[in-house]
A protein has these predicted regions:
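Transmembrane alpha-helical segments in multi-pass inner-membrane proteins
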Residues: 226, 230-234, 243-308
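Single transmembrane alpha-helix segments in multi-pass membrane proteins
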Residues: 23-88, 113-120, 263, 267-277, ...
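Helix-loop-helix "hairpin" substructures at the membrane interface of multi-pass membrane proteins
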Residues: 92-100, 107-111, 165-247
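Cytosolic-side transmembrane-helix boundaries in multi-pass membrane proteins
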Residues: 1-25, 206-209, 213, 217-220, ...
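Transmembrane helix-bundle core of multi-pass membrane transporters
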Residues: 7, 122-194, 223-224, 244-249, ...
Length: 345
């Protein structure tokens, strides 16, 4: 194997992409409709919310944190904006999206302040937030759905670009949710790769002590990462409402595991300092295609959860084993260099 090929295979994105192609091939062998344009677009539409939230979660995981309240944030935004639309008939999509982003960003910022200013462990801070939001929603909605949303948001959810009619007379095209997800990816990529803020977050995640020594404000960077994730959740929540045409306050129970799983499958390390937009996208698609393939193969939803959960555990375990090996190798190199230095002296 050439040195260049070895370096390519060492990139997490390449290995995830190879697994994605393998899953697609196996699923196609079981069901020939898997690779049809209609199915691929349905998969993307159904997972646009997951992908958008994963882009926000990526920043948090890069900092070495985690947010298990993401599902509760989604539910909160859908319920509050859904109630406004239901009771007033308000249907200005731009303002609704901005409101959703503001609500999600506020909750995310509160999470970030609890972690950065109060020093609470991320899992404790966000778990407490999730519990508080869930309790409020149960009290506020009594578990009832919100229906009768403005027609404009329903029509928006059905919007397709480059539409054509297939042989059956059905309309096929690129769903608007794909473009919204692409926008979320572009914003996240630009933030990480083209701004000092994004590079500072990467540096802090890799080595918080060194980042602070060179003058980076770790507390502000952490708070921003959680706020950004909340804004992405708010953006995704409105997209979800446009897809479902109604609001179910219980729709996102356990959803945070899907979001975290997609980011981890894409190569981000839970220890921080590692992760990319491309890897997260591939991880989300791998997650989505595995679920879709199992559905088309008529596998029970219970077994689907077991299989997907097992894959996530294997991915995390593999990454941690690889990280431990690299740490041991680096420690050995440091010891050898120290011994050589003493020998020269």
């Amino acid at each position: 194997m050439s040195e260049r090929l070895k370096r390519m295979m060492g990139h997490k994105e390449v290995s995830v992409g190879a697994m994605l192609l393998g899953v697609m091939l196996i699923s196609w062998l079981f069901n020939s409709t898997f690779l049809s344009f209609e199915n691929l677009m349905d998969v993307i539409k159904s997972n646009a919310v997951l992908g958008t939230c994963a882009m926000g979660m990526l920043l948090i995981i890069i900092t070495g944190g985690i947010d298990v309240s993401i599902g509760s944030q989604l539910a909160l935004v859908t319920v509050l904006t859904g109630q406004i639309m239901n009771r007033t008939g308000f249907d200005n999509l731009i303002l609704i999206y901005l409101l959703g982003i503001a609500i999600g960003g506020a909750v995310g910022l509160l999470n970030g302040l609890m972690v950065s200013r109060l020093g609470l462990p991320p899992i404790i801070a966000t778990l407490g937030m999730a519990s508080s939001i869930d309790g409020f929603l149960r009290y506020y909605t009594n578990g009832t759905w919100i229906n009768q949303l403005p027609q404009r948001i329903i029509d928006f959810g059905l919007t397709k670009f480059f539409s054509l009619r297939n042989a059956n007379g059905s309309e096929i095209g690129v769903p608007v949710q794909f473009l919204l997800f692409a926008l979320a990816m572009l914003v996240t990529w630009f933030l990480i790769k083209r701004t000092m803020l994004g590079r500072s977050i990467m540096a802090m995640g890799s080595n918080p002590v060194s980042a602070q020594r060179i003058g980076l404000n770790n507390k502000r960077l952490t708070a921003f990462a959680y706020a950004f994730s909340g804004m992405m959740a708010g953006f995704a929540a409105i997209t979800y409402t446009s897809i479902m045409k109604s609001v179910d306050p219980n729709a996102f129970i356990g959803y945070e595991m899907n979001v975290i799983g997609a980011v981890v499958l894409g190569g981000a390390l839970l220890t921080g300092g590692s992760g990319s937009v491309l890897g997260t996208f591939l991880g989300m698609m791998l997650f989505a295609f595995i679920s879709n393939g199992l559905t088309l193969a008529r596998i029970s939803t219970y077994w689907q959860s077991i299989i997907v959960g097992g894959i996530i555990l294997l991915a995390v375990s593999f990454d941690m084993i690889k990280l431990r090996r690299e740490e041991r190798r680096q420690t050995k190199v440091d010891i050898d260099m120290t011994a050589q230095g003493k020998g020269v002296a």
